[in-house]
Amino acid sequence: MKKKCVCKRVAAALLAAGMIFSAVGCRTTEAEKENGHAAEQDKNGEKDSVVVTMPTTSEPEAGFDPAYGWGAGEHTHEPLIQSTLTTTTADLKIGKDLATDYSVSEDGLTWTVTIRDDVKFTDGEILTAEDVAFTYNHCRDESTVSDFTMLKEAVAIDATTVEFHMDHPCSIWPYTMAVVGIIPEHAYDEGYGQNPIGSGRYVLKQWDKGQQIIFEANPEYYGEAPKIRQVTVLFMEEDAALAAAMAGQADVAHTAASYSEQQVKGYELLAVQTVDNRGFNLPVGEVTEKDGITYGNAFTNDVNVRRAINLGIDRDEMIENVLNGYGTKAYSVCDKMPWYNEDCEVEYDQEEAVRLLEEAGWKAGADGIREKAGVRAAFTLMFSNGDSVRQALAEDTANQLKELGIEVKTEGVGWDTAYDRAQSEPLLWGWGAHTPMELYNIYHTDASEEGIGAARYSPYINETVDNYMDEALAASSVEDSYELWQKAQWDGTTGIIQEGDIPWIWLCNIDHLYFVREGLHVAEQKIHPHGHGWSIINNVDQWNWEM
């Protein structure tokens, strides 16, 4: 029945996809259609273009302005149209793009960056430190999707030197510099996001909103000339993306684990490892209320309950049954990152999980569900409406925890209520970024007046963990900060892992899957962050067709 259902959806999507391709007018010759080729050829007869599908949610609603999410938004990626000061390497260390050098003052409050003097925007104007300062001050003042509150001011010292004056030390600033695209001060106006001018590898050629975006190689790019000269991005749901591959109308089509067994003639399945994790919070603290929001949870406040849940989940089973094997076990929000602490890892041990619950006084009742002092071992595990993977993970979690005597009800919710409810009820989240700031955002005490003086997304307080993260931000270099981020996870005595407070349970990192046309060499991918979208074409300029 499952396969029949998939086939029906694909058949419908084929029809829809055909309508899309007619509407956007994909430039595919009859000969190419006959051979199932979407790629175009250059004047030498070599293919130099690709057609890539992405989820509809990947289309940048506000356009290509870094202040409003392009590159530096919720799902970080390289901005393509613009240059950045730094880059991240394959092993997630820091490299250089516009920057030729950078340093930080002894007190950590001033970053000095020198930039190349040979870079031009696509309108012919030279890119200078004034443009860099303008970009960052603009993001500080206007960004609604990224946190630039640590930046006090960016100042151009001369044409090739910019200083970033910080409100507090931020050793991981180079990771921010890797995703903020530099925009031209002289050409910036309210319409910039729709008609961007940059200095990156590609220029925006065409944007048919709701359908496609076409990029062309920047002929004046200062780096190595892109091997792929035209990139067409089609926005569609997974059903339609599969149909596009089956019809030969896409060279790279994003897909999901539920479609991974589909055989598409002329295509191979590419699985990219990620730190796109799924996990859920377990609120810590006694139940209290502030401003109409409930905080804490009488059941999950017990650290032995949290430890039992972490041990009692068979992540291998979950990956096999929910993700068709396309994922890796997650033990933190930052698995495989340079700042990851391997002490986070645990082995599935149902017997030990039961023992922890028993010793903590959680005894099975007549219906098999545990109780203690009138508190039932039960909670609701929320997931975002319409996300079938999160729903399946939530239901699998509920089934597994029932074997421990824990009752879990699952509920689809909207984000308009999920954030507040997560202060007292577990919510299945998706995280994963190329910066250790994600650890800070999840586990560090929120200093704002909102909430109860605990971590932002779920009640949790540990001053030692806070101190390590504060020290990490104040470190003399990003490399020196790694050990401190690792100690924040576990220092041998306290932390956020199994032997510590374990306020979050991490389940899996979801592989990003793509159907790739045979003959197309997709350059080696660095670990993808959260978001099955733009990351795949971070290095599209290095792809090539094998003739």
Language-model features and meaning:
Residues 219-263, 407-409:
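Ligand-site clamp/hinge motif
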Residues 363-433, 512:
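Ligand/substrate-recognition segments at binding pockets and active sites
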Residues 128-135, 159-163, 200-201, 229-230, ...:
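Alpha-helical secondary-structure segments
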